[in-house]
Amino acid sequence: PADLDEFVRRYRVDRILLAVPSTTRRRRAEILRRLEALNVHTQSVPDLHDVVSGRARVDELREIDVADLLGRDPVPPNTELLDASIRGKSVMVSGAGGSIGSELCRQIVLLAPKRVVLFELSEIALYDIERELRTMIESRRLDVEVFALLGNAHHKYRVRDVLQSFGVQTVYHAAAYKHVPIVEQNLMEGVHNNVFSTWHAAEAALEIGVETFVLISTDKAVNPTSVMGATKRLAEIVLQSLQTQTARTRFCMVRFGNVLGSSGSVVPLFQEQIRRGGPVTVTHRDVRRYFM
C-alpha cells in the first residue's frame, strides 16, 4: 500500500511476511527494495510449486535469500532430462559435501532416485550433508536410500568398488578445488585433484559401465587464464578422449559460472561481514562480478 511506512510506524510492526510467492523476480525485488528502508524483519512463505511438489511445507517461513534480489525469474530445469538420469536410478555424487555437490544432492533426492551415494573426502562435510538429507527424506516421506561413503576420487579402485557395489548408473563428479588463488599457489595439488582424480573416477566409471558421467566444470575452462581454469579444461579433454573409447558410457560436462552464495564466493563473505556489523570490503571498486 502507498501508506506502508505510516502503517508500520503506527502499529509498531516488527515483522513482515512476504506472501507473494508466484510474483515475478523483478516485482519481488522491487518490493524488497521498498521494505529495506523500513528496517523490519522480512520473511517469505514458500512457493506454491514447492509445496505441491513436496520441496517445502506450507507452514515453512523462510528468510529472504540473496536470490530474491535477482531481477529476473530463474530458468526452470528440463524435467525430462533429469528424469532420464535420476528417476529410479542409483546416483553417486563425488564431492557431495561441497557447496555445489551438496546442492546437487538436495535436488537429486527430490527427483525419486532409487538411491543416492554420497562420496566425500571430508568427514565433517559428509556427516553434515548425510544428516540434512536424512532429515529431508524423513520429513517429506521420500522413498530414497542414502549411503555416506568416505573416499578420494583419485583412488580409482576405491571408486570402482563403490560404483560396482551400489550399482551406480549416474555419476555427478563435483569433487574439485575451485578457488583460483589457492590453486595458483598449490599447482601440483590442483592438477592432482582436478585432473587426475577426474581421470581415475571416469576410468572407473568406464570399466564398470556406468550409464552417465557428468563432470561439473567451470566457465574458467574457456581460454583459461589461471591454473584452476587450465586444470578443469584438462579434465574436460580427458573425458572427451575417454568418450572415443566407448559408446556404453556417456561422458558429459557442464560449465558453471560463479554460483550465487556458494562457499568461498563474495556473497557469504558480505553476509558474514554484515552480521558482524561491518565493514563490508570489496577487492576493488571497479570489479564487476557475475553470478548464476
Explain the meaning of each model-derived region.
Residues 147-170:
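Conserved Rossmann-fold cofactor-binding substructure of NAD(P)-dependent oxidoreductases
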Residues 90-111:
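N-terminal Rossmann NAD(P)H-binding glycine-rich loop of SDR-like oxidoreductase domains
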Residues 1-53, 121-130, 147, 151:
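A solvent-exposed beta-alpha-beta segment
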Residues 29-45, 115-122, 165-166, 170, ...:
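NAD(P)-cofactor binding segment of oxidoreductase domains
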Residues 2, 28-90, 96-97, 206:
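Flexible, Lys/Arg-rich cytosolic regulatory linkers and terminal tails that connect or flank
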Residues 134, 203-206, 227, 233-292:
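NAD(P)-dependent short-chain dehydrogenase/reductase
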Residues 8, 12-15, 113-114, 163-172, ...:
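Proline-aspartate-enriched helix->loop->beta-strand connector
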Residues 54, 173, 177-236, 241-242:
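Conserved Rossmann-fold NAD(P)-dependent oxidoreductase catalytic core, especially the SDR/UDP-sugar
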